Amino acid sequence: MLQEAWERITPFVPSEKIFVVTSEAYIDVVRQQIPQMPAANIIGELEGHGKAPCIGLSALHLRQLDPEAVMAVLTADHYIERADELRRALGAAAQVATEGRLVTLGIQPNRPATGYGYIERGEKLAQVSGHDVYRVKKFTEKPDLATAQAFTESGRYYWNSGMFIWKVSTILHEFEKLMPQFYAQLIEIDAALGTAEEQVVLERVWAKVENETIDYGIMERAEDVAVIPVDIGWSDVGSWATLLELLPADAEGNVIVGQHIGLDTKGCLVHSSRRLVTTIGLEDMVVVDTEDALLVCPKERAQDVKKLVDMLKEMGKDEYL
């Protein structure tokens, strides 16, 4: 999926201006997946602290190239069917961002999904390159089914794609205003970038950075946020159940990755990285077998895997994450 994300964006942005932020442990994997990417453009996080710190660190690197650059935040685990439309929307969003606005892409919902956050649109601000631009009225975290149904039927709500576009100077100003403690840490890191002390300072400062999402840290509290609705054939492959929609199924509606033998098994996702999985009498289930863990759940509960991840973190079982 990382390779697909690279291929989606390279017709729009030169490779030397594309950066990947990942865990330090995966830097070599990224280099193997995208060997044509400049090594200096792979930024390794010592420790994950959420999307806000990740974006802030990226903005520092981009500011060194161009203080007035427009920055697009994209995610590698998204499936996007219509890449051309995404690139057109990004072009329109970049034009809006030059005015000093924070811009996000809102996905036209095709069902009442409870696994996504929602964006409520406000007044129409403009039309840019054929794309309507609205002021964001409100962000809502993942709703219950009844609320998601109401949102979908209203026509005023979009799924929060997690894709953002803004000027580097704009987002850094928002960090200064809304997350001043983190901004002070960024300034400390910025002073050391490109020097012999860079790694030492980064390790010392990053250990003190607090976890924060970009939605709560910035987007929900910023004053000038715009949304551009898009219909790009989007899925957030953050859920195992999503693979049932994206990958080809057999005659019984099962999506199988790896070795599987099933009896009376229908509508299931079975993913095994190392050994044969056998099932009897399963319907609409997710079975994921990896080297060190096994997940079994109804597909409608697949979004709750994120709750299990939180539980594992609280229990100190980071080796399973």
Task: Describe the residue ranges of each PLM region.
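Short beta-strand segments
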Residues: 21, 72-75, 104-108, 140, ...
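Conserved N-terminal catalytic core of the sugar/cofactor nucleotidyltransferase
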Residues: 1-75, 79-85, 91, 300, ...
